[in-house]
Amino acid sequence: LSERADFPNVPAFLGAIEYRRPKADPTVVCLLQSAATNEGDVWTLTLDAMGRYYERVLGRKADLQNETAPPGALLDELIGGIYPDKATQLGQRTGELHLALASSTEDRAFAPEPFNAMAQRSVYQNMRASLRRAFTLLERKLPELPKAFRNEAKEVLTAEEEILGREKRLLDRHTNAAKIRIHGDYHLGQLLYTGKDFVILDFEGEPARPLSERKLKRS
């Protein structure tokens, strides 16, 4: 990203050590990047903004009952600060990141690939397997849930086959999309705020998933 796509919102690549085997792709053992001066991660920034928002709401609880300002203007006033503008900026950086990831046509590891029927079925099977794991976990944890939520959890478990059936609709839809390399574990904790912009970190994918799955391109 920093060398070929000239994407500035990631730490600059400085070097890497690879393990190479005959007739196999090289494996990166360690990676050296530039340090990113920052004010903390964006998850903390968001929690701080939400905390201030709720403080303002509670502080104006009586006034808000008779508030006549348009909802959008009132929300901007209650959120306050720079957070709304920064959320817009983060959306722009996210789009630019994916454009950069899809920009390579020469490197096989990064070149976009067609989202064909095989890829479509693979996505469906992965989604179905993830849902199965979620239902299994929910059923196992059901006795530990607060009583207030158990009936709702049981309703979800009862609807398991219906929910899984709805996912199957994915196989009936055709698309001209492409698969590209993605971050793989993109959330606010993977972003640093510099005071003016954002730095995106940790492109190794979701650690709980197998490496073979993390290397797959997504649409």
State what each model feature region is.
Residues A134-I180:
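An alpha-helical support segment within catalytic cores of ATP-dependent transferases
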Residues L1-P143, L188, T194-S219:
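Conserved ATP-binding subdomain of kinase catalytic cores across diverse folds
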Residues I182-G189:
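Canonical protein kinase catalytic loop motif
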Residues V29, I180-I182:
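Hydrophobic core residues within well-ordered beta-strands of beta-rich domains
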